[in-house]
């Protein structure tokens, strides 16, 4: 049984599933922005869908706040996603993920395709977001062990869908599992 926020998701109605979505924020691997909508409109989208109680002015104010929180300069808000850099698209995706003040944030390979400087920037945004939003659970899916250890206070390592080890990062450094040790040697100790 998989429970989210105390509810068994296998028995949820369609209506309950839709209501549950407002508790989640997802930063997708490739940002998954609407190409035909401005950066600002991409962030406003989940608010329009799930917060019918908000006025247009309130939605706009929240979107501006989340974009600012994500570190995106206001001069880019009226641009289309294709007109901004990969790092800016990630920031826009993060702002959209944060728009509903979710209880659970999921980051799917958030630094894929980014250079080391942008990778560190995105990692820092994730850390800042997690540290400033008390009561929010964050799940970061990554092949970058160094980042996982830097960001996560609890890490799980999977191989072919099976959990090899889970716990605090320090546990991985002390593991005698040969596969875990190999990953750690390649991904963390070399850094």
What are the residue ranges of the model-derived segments?
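ABC ATPase "signature
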Residues: 166-167
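Conserved ABC ATPase "signature" region
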Residues: 8, 56-75
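Conserved ABC ATPase signature
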Residues: 80-84, 88
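Helical segment within the ABC ATPase nucleotide-binding domain
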Residues: 120-134
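Catalytic Walker B motif of ABC-type/P-loop ATPase nucleotide-binding domains
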Residues: 105-108
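Conserved catalytic motifs of ABC-family nucleotide-binding domains
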Residues: 101
């Amino acid at each position: 049984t998989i429970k989210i926020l105390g509810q068994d998701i296998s028995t949820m109605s369609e209506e309950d599933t839709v209501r549950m979505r407002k508790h989640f924020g997802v930063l997708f691997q490739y940002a998954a922005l609407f190409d035909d909508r401005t950066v600002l409109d991409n962030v406003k989208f989940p608010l329009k869908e799930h917060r019918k109680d908000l006025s247009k002015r309130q939605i706009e104010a929240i979107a501006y706040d989340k974009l600012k929180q994500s570190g995106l300069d206001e001069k880019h808000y009226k641009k289309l996603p294709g007109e901004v850099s990969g790092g800016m698209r990630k920031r826009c995706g993060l702002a959209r993920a944060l728009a509903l003040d979710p209880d659970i944030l999921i980051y799917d390979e958030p630094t894929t395709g980014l250079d080391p400087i942008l990778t560190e920037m995105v990692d820092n945004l994730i850390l800042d977001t997690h540290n400033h939003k008390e009561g929010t659970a964050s799940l970061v899916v990554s092949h970058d062990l160094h980042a996982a250890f830097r960001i996560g206070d609890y890490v799980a390592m999977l191989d072919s869908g099976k959990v090899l080890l889970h716990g605090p990062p320090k546990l991985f450094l002390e593991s005698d599992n040969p596969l875990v040790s190999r990953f750690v040697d390649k991904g963390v100790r070399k850094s």
